Design a protein with these regions (language model features):
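A short, solvent-exposed, low-complexity linear motif enriched for acidic/polar residues
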Residues: 23-257
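Polybasic, lysine/arginine-rich low-complexity segments
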Residues: 2, 22-23
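C-terminal motif of bacterial Sec signal peptides marking the signal peptidase cleavage site
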Residues: 17-19
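Bacterial N-terminal signal peptides that target proteins for export
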Residues: 1-8
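Residue-level signal for mature regions of secreted extracellular proteins and peptides
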Residues: 13-14
Length: 257
């Protein structure tokens, strides 16, 4: 299947901190040097949470760019997470290890949408950066190097391996579109340059930068960053996309309006 070059261009972060403080006359504990936080992704379309359905009769209908969409599957990969402190320094989270620093987010598995980051330096953070996909130098189906992520991305309910190449799918969307429920299938990822060597051509990995509306305080109390991903931008972003049926050769043609 031809790779779509659609990239979700708008991801908005809102920050919710759960903490409490009280005045201590004489502190008895040292300030912790490491803390944890959670990045929770919430997938929406417009202002509506996305609900999946096994088939067209059970999937919820959404309107995007005047087109009806229904979703049966939504998955994508997040990796290369970095947090920027208020002093401008950057803390990288296992950026060279897909087993501990890359995640397959699966809309049908709510727990997979919560990325638990542990052993972070305590303090205040003002920005979060991450890659949508996997950067070129790590985008290889290397089971021996990253067995955990390889298995997670390749298991039956994920299927984020490309069949024709050595890299990973970055996005996998399945569902239906139009009033007559035509099949919707959007798979994105880096293109292949040479089918013999499986060399990567166009690198589709993209970095997302989120400036937090309020500093994230990592310390002894739990903290949470809620990141909202608006799938309306799939068709209704800066470039409007109109879906059309496949032609006789099995190739679809996206039409910009």
């Amino acid at each position: 299947m031809k790779n779509s070059k659609i990239v979700f261009s708008t991801i908005i972060a809102s920050l919710a901190l759960f903490s409490c403080t009280k005045k201590e006359e004489t502190p008895t504990l040292e300030t912790p040097t490491l803390g944890n936080t959670t990045l929770e992704f919430q997938n929406i379309i417009g202002s509506n949470p996305i609900e999946l359905g096994a088939d067209a009769s059970t999937a919820k209908s959404y309107i995007s760019n005047n087109q009806t969409l229904k979703f049966s599957e939504i998955k994508y990969i997040i990796s290369n997470i970095r947090l920027v402190r208020t002093d401008g320094s950057t803390i990288s989270y296992n950026v060279d290890n897909l087993d501990t620093g890359a995640f397959v987010l699966n809309q049908s598995n709510p727990e997979s949408l919560k990325l638990h980051l542990s052993d972070l330096q305590t303090g205040a953070y003002k920005e979060i950066l991450f890659d949508y996909g996997i950067r070129k130098e790590l985008n290889h189906l290397d089971e021996s190097r990253f067995p955990k992520f390889y298995k997670e991305a390749g298991k039956n309910d994920s299927r984020m391996h490309w069949e024709w190449g050595k890299g990973y799918r970055f996005t996998k969307i399945e569902g239906f579109w139009g009033n007559d429920n035509k099949v919707l299938s959007v798979h994105t990822g880096s293109t292949i340059k040479d089918r013999d060597t499986k060399a990567i051509g166009v690198d589709a990995c993209r970095t997302v930068k989120l400036v937090l509306p309020k500093n994230l305080e990592v310390g002894s109390n739990p903290s949470l960053v809620v990141i909202t991903a608006d799938f309306d931008k799939l068709l209704n972003g800066s470039q409007k996309i109109t879906l059309v049926e496949e032609d006789e050769d099995g190739e679809g043609n996206d039409v910009s309006t």
